[in-house]
């Protein structure tokens, strides 16, 4: 490569490094807010899931309709955050289909749709976009829950797959159960709550669905921002390594050019003598 080519590459990498450093700073600010909001949001999820655990609610084996919700966002540059959710969804779909279940999927975020739509377009019930641009609110979760309830697909049980935040450098792809109102009512252990009015239980079940979606959105957002922060930090470090190597190559090439020119000058002077 010529000195001009190396200079052009150096300039390009330095510009990219400026972008990755800026993106890391933005992700760090968003991560700090997401982590701060995650702790109170976890109460929504753990409280709602506690009912299913304590009542030991399980989907009946003879029921076939299953729903899988995948949580991602509209933005990338955050490692394997979205592909890990898609992989888990594919594994679940394959297992459930093999067991004779009817499976429909819901994509929260454009990324999950772009990964799965080509191969599973016939199984998409609904998808949601404009996710991840702003911190998710309970209102966003309520809109998604309402859309699912009004979709006309009367699933018996299902699951929501998302990335659960563990630390600033780690997350885990998690799966939590969701159930239809009819499945909850039919559960054996629900008989201990016989004094609960059916309308009250249905309202609570709908509220539960919104709670679990809100909880998963908050977990996913925090995981995404921490992963993006890490990815941009790694990209900046890799850019620094490339800049160092190219600078060394540039200096060696320049030295070789200067040496060659000196030899030519000396040879020319010797020829004149």
Swiss-Prot record:
Disulfide bonds: none annotated. Pfam families: ATP-synt. GO terms for cellular component: mitochondrial inner membrane; proton-transporting ATP synthase complex. InterPro entries: ATP_synth_F1_ATPase_gsu, ATP_synth_F1_gsu, ATP_synth_F1_gsu_CS. It is found in: Mitochondrion inner membrane. The keyword Acetylation applies. The modification N6-succinyllysine is found at residues 24, 90, 129, 245. The keyword Amino-acid biosynthesis does not apply. Its main location: mitochondrion. GO terms for molecular function: proton-transporting ATP synthase activity, rotational mechanism. Gene3D superfamilies: 3.40.1380.10, ATP synthase, gamma subunit, helix hairpin domain. CDD domains: F1-ATPase_gamma. Keywords: Acetylation, ATP synthesis, CF(1), Hydrogen ion transport, Ion transport, Membrane, Mitochondrion, Mitochondrion inner membrane, Phosphoprotein, Transport. GO terms for biological process: cellular response to nitric oxide; proton motive force-driven ATP synthesis; proton motive force-driven mitochondrial ATP synthesis. The modification N6-acetyllysine is found at residues 14, 30, 90, 113, 129, 172. It is a peripheral membrane protein. PANTHER family: ATP SYNTHASE GAMMA CHAIN, ATP SYNTHASE SUBUNIT GAMMA, MITOCHONDRIAL. Belongs to the ATPase gamma chain family. Component of the ATP synthase complex composed at least of ATP5F1A/subunit alpha, ATP5F1B/subunit beta, ATP5MC1/subunit c (homooctomer), MT-ATP6/subunit a, MT-ATP8/subunit 8, ATP5ME/subunit e, ATP5MF/subunit f, ATP5MG/subunit g, ATP5MK/subunit k, ATP5MJ/subunit j, ATP5F1C/subunit gamma, ATP5F1D/subunit delta, ATP5F1E/subunit epsilon, ATP5PF/subunit F6, ATP5PB/subunit b, ATP5PD/subunit d, ATP5PO/subunit OSCP. This is ATP synthase F(1) complex subunit gamma, mitochondrial. It comes from Rattus norvegicus.
């Amino acid at each position: 490569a010529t000195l001009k080519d190396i200079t052009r590459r150096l300039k390009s990498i330095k510009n990219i490094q400026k972008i990755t450093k800026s993106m890391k700073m933005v992700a760090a600010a968003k991560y700090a807010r997401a982590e701060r909001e995650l702790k109170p949001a976890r109460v929504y999820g753990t409280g709602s899931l506690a009912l299913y655990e304590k009542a030991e609610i399980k989907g009946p084996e003879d029921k076939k309709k299953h729903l899988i919700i995948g949580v991602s966002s509209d933005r990338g540059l955050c490692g394997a955050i979205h592909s890990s959710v898609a992989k888990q969804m594919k594994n679940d779909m394959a297992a459930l289909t093999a067991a004779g279940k009817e499976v429909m999927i819901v994509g929260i975020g454009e990324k999950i749709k772009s990964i799965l739509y080509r191969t599973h377009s016939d199984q998409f019930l609904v998808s949601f976009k404009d996710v991840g641009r702003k911190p998710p609110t309970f209102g966003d979760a309520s809109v998604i829950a309402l859309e699912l309830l009004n979709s006309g697909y009367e699933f018996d049980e299902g699951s929501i797959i998302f990335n659960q935040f563990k630390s600033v450098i780690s997350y885990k792809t998690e799966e939590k159960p969701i159930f239809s109102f009819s499945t909850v009512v039919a559960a054996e252990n629900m008989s201990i709550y016989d004094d609960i009015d059916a309308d009250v239980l249905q309202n609570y079940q709908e509220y539960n669905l919104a709670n679990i979606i809100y909880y998963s959105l908050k977990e996913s957002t925090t995981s995404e921002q921490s992963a993006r922060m890490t990815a941009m930090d790694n990209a900046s470090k890799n850019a620094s390594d490339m800049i160092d190597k190219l600078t060394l190559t540039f200096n060696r090439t320049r030295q070789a050019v200067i040496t060659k020119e000196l030899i030519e000058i000396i040879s020319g002077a010797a020829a004149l003598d």
